[in-house]
Design a protein with these regions (language model features):
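RNA pseudouridine synthases
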Residues: 1-332
């Protein structure tokens, strides 16, 4: 007896090797087990047998043949993985909707809200709110746990997200993210003062070798020919908006959208996001309630109508209140 698990590749994992994707999708699975399954033909990619060296595209469909757990074997209980006891339920949570039509909606996510359910976060997420607001009219090709979610921002990051109401719209938006045609602008306040008024950070990001729960710039993954192996290419453009004593107000544009990208890149330059308890200083000069990072603007092509759309959100109170406490830096 066996089960098949259906997986859809999200935009942020486009370009990833299939064995690494499987390992991240199924934490119980080791890399060697994933490669074994691929060698045994247990994984299909878009309807054809997958190869162990295949790299994935956003929206690609994986079908994984999972063995049934047998007492005495070391295989995890895949039945529990496939059919968890609970799935996200609709919850009447207020949404700040910036735009909505029959195919998609753009929401302004508040700080402290998790985007989708995960370990320790089964309620109060954006997905729970979307399930209440949209009901059955929500893209589910990426699973009910990520219903409607096209891209993510961190729990303690506020700002704009586009969500898909149907699978066709999801795939159209995911393709734009993969092709870097979605405009994503953030504003942040960082510790310290960047030397240049504007610049580009082009450094690969992967799991930290010191702490697997964190991300890090991985220069060791850069190959002589300029390609990246074992991490993911990440590009962040920044512009200084104003300098303060001990802090800098920045506008950032994402060319790629890797996990914690802005936070990791700026921390690597020695200017971590103010209030970032993961990548910031252990003893910051100012204590904040979470990180000062806001997804300020979002632009994309409507996946159905073809119209180019652009949205902006005001800086939230926590951000502007912090700015008012800072002392502008005198020009040298």
């Amino acid at each position: 007896m066996s089960n098949r698990l259906q997986l859809t590749v999200p935009p942020e994992q486009s370009g990833q090797r299939i064995d690494k994707f499987l390992q991240e999708a199924l934490p119980e699975l080791s890399r060697s087990q994933a490669q074994k399954w691929l060698a045994q033909g247990m994984v299909e990619l878009d309807g054809a047998p997958a190869g162990k060296n295949d790299r994935l595209k956003a929206g690609a469909q994986l079908s994984v043949l999972l063995p049934q757990a047998v007492q005495g074997e070391e295989e995890p209980d895949w039945e529990a993985v496939l059919h968890p006891q609970t799935e996200p339920q609709p919850q009447e949570i207020p949404l700040d909707i910036v735009y909505e039509d029959e195919h998609l909606l753009v929401v302004n996510k508040p700080k402290h809200m998790v985007v989708h359910p995960g370990a320790g976060n089964s309620e109060g997420t954006l997905v729970n709110a979307l399930l209440w607001h949209c009901g059955e009219h929500l893209a589910r090709c990426n699973g009910i746990e990520r219903a409607g979610i096209v891209h993510r921002i961190d729990k303690d990051t506020s700002g704009l997200l586009v969500c898909a109401k149907d699978d066709l719209s999801y795939r159209g938006l995911a393709e734009q993210i993969q092709e870097h045609t979605v405009d994503r602008f953030y504003e942040t306040v960082v510790y310290g003062n960047l030397k240049e008024d504007e610049g580009t950070i082009d450094l690969p990001i992967g799991r930290s070798l010191k702490d697997r729960k964190k991300m890090a710039v991985r220069l060791d993954c850069l190959q002589p020919d300029g390609t990246v192996e074992g991490a993911r290419q990440a590009v962040t453009h920044y512009q200084v908006l104003r300098r303060y004593n001990g802090f800098t107000h920045l506008r950032c544009r994402l060319e790629t959208g890797r996990t914690h990208q802005i936070r990791v890149h700026l921390a690597y330059l020695g200017c971590p996001v103010a209030g970032d308890e993961v990548y910031g200083p252990k003893k910051p000069i100012r204590r904040l309630e979470g990180q000062c990072l806001h997804a300020r603007a979002l632009g994309f092509t409507h996946p159905i109508s073809g119209e180019r759309l652009y949205f902006e959100s005001e800086l939230p109170d926590y951000f502007t209140s912090f700015l008012r406490t800072l002392v502008p830096r005198e020009e040298e």
